Amino acid sequence: DATSDLVFRTSSGQVVNTLQGIPERMRIKSDGHVLPAITNTQDLGSSSKRWRNVYTTDLQLSNEGKTNDVDGTWGNYTIQEGESDLFLINNRNGKKYVFLLKEVS
């Protein structure tokens, strides 16, 4: 229910009496999901203000709609944890990889 969402907007410092025309920046949905207003426009942290830890299950990575700096393509990957390995799944072609890890002491 969108009426139960918490919405963050910015107004460029002017006093306003209505939300009309004030751009939405972020939304915390009533189901607990935190979403940017527009895809690929917001950062979580910055180069000088970083989050200490991120606790997640699988890690979804995609730069769809943009290209990388190395070969100009885009990707969509998932990193998953196994008991003794880390796995990388290419969500575009279905190929699966294991990270080659070297134990250090």
Say what each PLM segment does.
Residues 57-74:
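Extracellular/surface-exposed low-complexity repeats and stalk/linker segments enriched in Gly/Pro
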